[in-house]
Amino acid sequence: YDLNGSEAYVFSTYGFGSGVTDFNWRNPLTTSAFGESAIDPDYDLSETFPAGFSPRFGQDDNDFALTGGYRSNNDGRFSYDLSAGYGRNQIEYFMYNSINASLGSASPTSFDIGTLTQSELTFNADFAYRATLDFLAEDMTFAFGAEQRTEEYEIGAGEYASFAIGPLAPEGFPSGSNGFPGFSPEQSGSSDQTSYAAYVDVEAPITDRWTVGAAVRFEDFSEFGNDTNGKLSTRYEVSPNLALRATASTGFRAPTPGQLFSERTSQGLDTTTLNIFTRGRYSPQGPIADVISLRDGVDILPLEPEESENLTAGLAW
């Protein structure tokens, strides 16, 4: 929408999809879920799946994004773009053609496994100025800006039958939905991270054929502190149809809240001790990691940001 030389804008996207895959076939002659139970004499999985079964694992996903802002028309030397954006992606997992054998005859054959949700909210302010300098072939472009970004990751628990340790567990019947146990309430929850960034980018045409550039970006993360990265670039036109270019830069990528705090575990019952055990992947930032690190010779380190150094060169034809 035009506003006297500037414009307001908004755009949005929405996408959805679904998919299903299967796990290996469960042989009724060798799978423990097909055993007989003294606790629940009515349980007979061979009546439900006489030829065995292949658990089916699926997902429904929804993705939504909305961006709006206010920007100049770029006709003058100074231009700007102020914007805000929100995005959300959610995956709902489900299983069917499966069983929680530890629940016996009370077990359903389809399960809601739980949900994973990632959302991001960003605010951006970008500015550019074209300066005329006598010693340059053309105007120098000076760009700068700032960004605030908040990420949130959420795990939603599945239905009780998808992760339950049922009454038949002491007899050796496996717990949780066969193939992929659901997310338990202990695994559910949300975590977030906020970052603030500022950047400066300069590009100068030294001659009609030779252009150089330099950029620096500073970013501060709520979970990691701050980091500074830079880039140097050059481009030389050998002819109207051929150019040489080269770039040297550093990079930084912080782990997301999902990578930092999410856990994926399942529980079972030791038929000898009748103790419940938990196995799976724990967060290196969580309390379990702190306890395990107290053991001799064990030191679980928290996730660190990825850092990189890059050199590129090439031809443009």
Q: What is the predicted function of each stretch?
A:
Residues 24-43, 96-106, 158-168, 230-233, ...:
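Flexible, surface-exposed loop regions and adjacent strand-edge segments
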Residues 192, 196, 219-229, 307-309:
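Solvent-exposed loop/turn segments connecting transmembrane beta-strands
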Residues 5-8, 77-80, 135-140, 209-212, ...:
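Repeated loop/turn-to-beta-strand initiation elements of outer-membrane beta-barrel proteins
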Residues 1-23, 27-51, 55-75:
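Transmembrane beta-barrel wall of Gram-negative outer-membrane proteins
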Residues 10-16, 82-88, 142-150, 198, ...:
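Transmembrane beta-barrel strands of outer-membrane/channel proteins
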Residues 88-92, 97, 146, 150-155, ...:
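Surface-exposed extracellular loop regions of Gram-negative outer-membrane beta-barrel proteins
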Residues 45-47, 53-67, 73-75, 86, ...:
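Outer-membrane beta-barrel transmembrane domain signature of Gram-negative proteins
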Residues 1, 66-72, 125-129, 198-204, ...:
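Residues on the lipid-exposed face of transmembrane beta-strands in outer-membrane beta-barrel proteins
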